Amino acid sequence: MKFFLATLFASAVSSIAVDRLIPGAQIIPESDTRALLRVGGHHDKYHDRRTITIRPSRNDTDDVSRDFLWGIKHANHGGRLLLKKGEKYVIGRKLDLTFLDDIEVQLDGELKFTDDVSYWQENNFYYDFQKSITFWRWGGKDIKIFGTGLLNGNGQRWYNEFAGQEILDPDNEYYRPILFLTENATRISVEGITQLNSPCWTNFFIQSKDVSFDDVYIHAFSTNKSALPKNSDGFDSLNVDGLTVTNTRVDVGDDCFSPKPNTTNIFVQNLLCNNTHGVSMGSIGQYPGVMDIIEHAYIENVTLLNGQNGARLKAWAGQDVGYGRINNITYKNIRIENTDAPVVLDQCYFDIEAAECAQYPSQVNVTNILFENISGTSSGKNGKVVADLVCSPNAVCSDIQLKNINLTSPAGSPPEIICEGVQGDIGVECQASAD
């Protein structure tokens, strides 16, 4: 009798599990190593988990966002969603993934968003900070995304239609989605994947803790020379404690790495930035009456090629802006080549006339900054100037040190370092701005 009841119960459980499946999906138990091997879900590096697969898209308009959400829910609490190598998964509907707890997503295929501009501009997650929107948002705790696959923002149409516009124009209403966004996430890691052609920022982390990226390639390019990617930053953050980026390449045409207000405990190592606006702290101090901070950052072994800026600190000035501090930042072992402004403190951000900046200077203090072992060449665009550190008269700039700086300019020698308004000895000879 007991055997009969046990068999009946097992049969019922099996039936329930099968009934829960959607067409094309599969649930593989953690113990079924052979089945995991067949689908590419067994790894030496990671422990086996209950693994979920879903059907791929048949073409670029076959939206599997409902299947994807089903897979995420069934992989939650200790499982893994596997997106298979050689397959494409098209997402055409916004997704709220802020309920996650102990989940892995193995991205070996391509996860691609539709370029239905009218849909996405009406259906998205909106954030007041710089009028940001996103296709989806990830949140919860203990979230791992890894693999060799592609997260594709399908940005070309967005680039074409945004050409000639500016994200920070108060009249701008052409909002473009961020490719990957976390909100209220704790311990989220991304490893090994490629992120391609985000319509706007590539990554934005909000109100999150312990975010890490390792061995990721971020690329944004356009097939239309008159409509290049804009604002396709590699990394942005807001109210984040613990942000780590290692062994990563970024080629996007805008900021390579640019934590924004209230980001603390930052670690960057072995980062390659090509065709970017540099590794920036900020911008901060944008919003009236609001205090922003960026604090405790260690940036080392970074290569910056063919860019607008190298190592940059940036803060807003103007009539209606905020205040704050950039504190305890180290840039060490930085190689810079063919870059307009290799080292720069910009306290007249954003796109502000010199007269207005002088009338309404930045109120962001810049303290305890170390630039050490900085080498390479500027592009010569700014003449012989290779470092420009001009502090706002309404801010405190102190304990700023330059050590072992070996930067040259094709415009001639000796290279020039500008410093103005900085308290104390900065460690190298410098001169006042000619402006």
Curated annotation (Swiss-Prot):
Origin: domain of life: Eukaryota
Signal peptide: 1-15
Database matches in Gene3D superfamilies: Single-stranded right-handed beta-helix, Pectin lyase-like (2.160.20.10)
Keyword entries, A-Z: Cell wall biogenesis/degradation, Disulfide bond, Glycoprotein, Glycosidase, Hydrolase, Repeat, Secreted, Signal
The keyword Secreted is assigned to this record: yes
GO molecular function: galacturan 1,4-alpha-galacturonidase activity; polygalacturonase activity
Entry annotation: catalytic residues: 254 (proton donor), 277
EC assignment: 3.2.1.67
Catalysis performed (reactions): [(1->4)-alpha-D-galacturonosyl](n) + H2O = alpha-D-galacturonate + [(1->4)-alpha-D-galacturonosyl](n-1)
A GO BP entry: pectin catabolic process
Subcellular location: Secreted
Glycosylation sites: 59, 184, 224, 262, 274, 301, 328, 365, 373, 406
PbH1 repeat spans: 208-239, 240-261, 262-283, 294-315, 326-347, 366-388
Keyword Hydrolase: yes
S-S bonds: 256-273, 391-397
Protein's job: Specific in hydrolyzing the terminal glycosidic bond of polygalacturonic acid and oligogalacturonates.
Family: Belongs to the glycosyl hydrolase 28 family.
Protein name as catalogued: Probable exopolygalacturonase B
Species per Swiss-Prot/TrEMBL record: Aspergillus oryzae (strain ATCC 42149 / RIB 40) (Yellow koji mold)
